[in-house]
UniProtKB/Swiss-Prot annotation:
Coiled coil: none annotated. Keywords: Cap snatching, Endonuclease, Eukaryotic host gene expression shutoff by virus, Eukaryotic host transcription shutoff by virus, Host cytoplasm, Host gene expression shutoff by virus, Host nucleus, Host-virus interaction, Hydrolase, Inhibition of host RNA polymerase II by virus, Manganese, Metal-binding, Nuclease, Phosphoprotein. One of its GO terms (molecular function) is endonuclease activity. Gene3D superfamilies: Influenza RNA-dependent RNA polymerase subunit PA, endonuclease domain (3.40.91.90). InterPro entries: INFV_PA, PA/PA-X, PA/PA-X_sf. Influenza RNA polymerase is composed of three subunits: PB1, PB2 and PA. Interacts (via C-terminus) with PB1 (via N-terminus). This is Polymerase acidic protein. Phosphorylated on serines and threonines by host kinases, including human casein kinase II. Binds 2 manganese ions per subunit. A motif (Nuclear localization signal 1 (NLS1)) lies at residues 124-139. It is found in: Host cytoplasm; Host nucleus.
Amino acid sequence: MEDFVRQCFNPMIVELAEKAMKEYGEDLKIETNKFAAICTHLEVCFMYSDFHFINEQGRSIIVELGDPNALLKHRFEIIEGRDRTMAWTVVNSICNTTGAEKPKFLPDLYDYKEDRFIEIGVTRREVHIYYLEKANKIKSEKTHIHIFSFTGEEMATKADYTLDEESRARIKTRLFTIRQEMASRGLWDSFRQSERGEETIEEKFEITGTMRNVADQSLPPNFSCLENFRAYVDGFKPNGYIEGKLSQMSKEVNARIEPFFKTTPRPIRLPDGPPCSQRSKFLLMDALKLSIEDPSHEGEGIPLYDAIKCMRTFFGWKEPYVVKPHEKGINPNYLLSWKQVLAELQDIENEEKIPKTKNMKKTSQLKWALGENMAPEKVDFDDCKDVSDLKQYYSDEPELRSISSWIQNEFNKACELTDSVWIELDEIGEDVAPIEHIASMRRNYFTAEVSHCRATEYIMKGVYINTALLNASCAAMDDFQLIPMISKCRTKEGRRKTNLYGFIIKGRSHLRNDTDVVNFVSMEFSLTDPRLEPHKWEKYCVLEIGDMLLRSAIAPVSRPMFLYVRTNGTSKIKMKWGMEMRRCLLQSLQQIESMIEAESSVKEKDMTKEFFENKSETWPIGESPKGVEEGSIGKVCRTLLAKSVFNSLYASPQLEGFSAESRKLLLIVQALRDNLEPGTFDLGGLYEAVEECLINDPWVLLNASWFNSFLTHALR
C-alpha cells in the first residue's frame, strides 16, 4: 500500500501526509491504510479549492491554469495540510478579519464567498452515516459539511454543494480512479474495511485478457512475463547496486566504494604565493564618504548636483601626489585624471546653470586609462583562414595567490553595525491572508536587525553604482561620462543624508551582447594608508589628495586623505545582477526563516517573537580556528547577509566551482556526523576538483579556510 500511495499521489501531498502522521505519532509503515486515507483527503481538499477565484465584483469564477486572471483572490483558504500551530493561526486570523465564529475543531477550508468554514469528508462507507458522525462531532451549524464517497455519492449541509457540478464531478472521478487502482492491486478491500475496523479478507485478483497482455508488453527489457518481474522486484536488494552499475559501464572503470571515517578527510590545500589582492568593483571597509545632512539644495537628487554639494563640505584639498604607484600602470596618467576631474568640476561650478550630466574631455590620460583604441583590430575570419600559423591569443596562467588577513577583516567589518539606516522597505499594504501576519512580523524583525548593517550599505552602494553605470552605458555610448558614486541613508535621528564616495569615469560602451565589457576608471576617497598593506592594493594607484580633521575625545586630529584610482571593467550582465543586489536581503531572510520554522516545529507553535526577543540565547554563526563561533540572533542575521553580499561582490567562476564541489564534500561529512556510514569512490578526484578552484580569489580562499576549520571541529 505504501508503494501505491507514493506512486499514485503528488509528492507534495505524500510529504504533508507523512508530516501529519508524524505529528500524531503514527507509523506510516504500519498504518498504511491511514496513510492512503490522509493522502486522499488532502487531494480532495486541494481539488475542491483549485481554479476557484473571486473577481473584483465579489463573484465566484473558475479560472483554468495558465490564465492571466490567476492573480485574482483565491475563493478558498486551505487549512488542511498545515501543521496544527499554523492552521490555528490561520483560523484565528480569519475569525478576526471576517467576524466568523471560531470552530471547536480544525476545519479543512474557509470559503470567502459564502463566509463559512467547510469540513470535507471522504468515506468508504455510506455517505449519510459518515455525515451524521461528522455533524455529531462538530456540533456547529456554522461549519458547512460536505462528504464524498468512492462510489460517486455525496452529501452536504442543507443540500448546498458549494461547487458547480463540473468541479464536483472532477473530485468524484478522481476518487473512483483511486478505487480502481487499489482494486487492481488487491488493496481495495483492506482499505475499504479498515474504516470500519472489519477483518481484512485477502482476495487474489487475477489479471486476464487484454490487461494481462498490456502488462506483459510493458515490462523492462530482459523480463518475459509479469511473474518474473514481480519475483525480481520482491527479491531486489539495493546493496551493491552502485558497484554493479559502474562495472557495467566500462571495463576500464574499476570503482570500489571506500568507507568514509573521521580520519579519512584531509584539509583542503590552499595555494602558496604572494598574498591575494582586492578585486571588488568599489572599496568596502576602506571607503570614505563626504556627506550632507538634510539636503535641500537646488537640483537635490540629481547626482552631479549632489556630488558638487558634497565636495564643497571638504576644505582640506591639497596638491595631489602618488603615494603608492601601480606596478604596471602609467601612474602620472592616474594623477592627471584626478586633476582633470577637479578642474572640470570647477568649470561646472563657474557656469550659470549646472548641467545634469558631465562628459569628460577625451584627454590622452583618460584615453589611456579607459583603454581607448587598445582593443586588437577585429579581422573577418574569411580574410585570414588561409594563414598557416593562425592560433589562439596566448595568455599566461593566472598566478597562484595565498590567503591574506585583510579579507577576513573585510568580512568582519561587513557584519558590523553603522550609525545609519540603509534600507526603508516600501509599505506593502494591509495583511490579507492569515499567513501574511507572520510574514510581516518576520520581515519587520529581520529589517530591524540588518537595516544598520554595513553589508546593507554595500548593497545600496552596489545598486546605485551599477544602475548609474548601466544607464550611462546605454545613454552615452561614445562619451567619457563622469558618474558620482552616491548613496542615501538616514541618521539615527531620522535625518536624510546624501553620501559621496568618489567618482567613476565610463569609457566607450557599445554593449551589444550581455558579456561585452565597458571599461571605467574609479576614483574613491579613503583614510586608509595603502602602505600598511601594499599587497591588498596591487591593482590601484593611490594618491594623497588632502588632509581631513577628525573629531576625537581630546582635540581634532588631522589625517591624510587618499584617493584610490584604478582601471576596471564590467559587463551588461554583471551590472544587471549588481542592480538586483537587494536579493541578498531576501536570501538571508529565507535562511533565518528556515531556522525559525525548525524551532517552531519542535515547540509546536510559532516562535518568531521568542526567536528575536530572547536576547540571552546564542546561535552558531560559523567556524573559526577557535571552534564554533556563537552570537545573538541579530549577529546571525548580519553574518548571513554579509555572506550573501560577498557572494555577489566577489562573484566569479572560482566561487561557482568551489561552492559546487565543496558542497559534495560537505554532504559526505554531514552524513558521517549523522551516523549514515557514507562511502565514497575517487575522493582524490573530488579534492582535485575543489582545489583547482583555489587560484587567487580572496573570497574563495577565505571560504576554503573556513571549510578547513569546519572539518577540524566537525570530525573531533
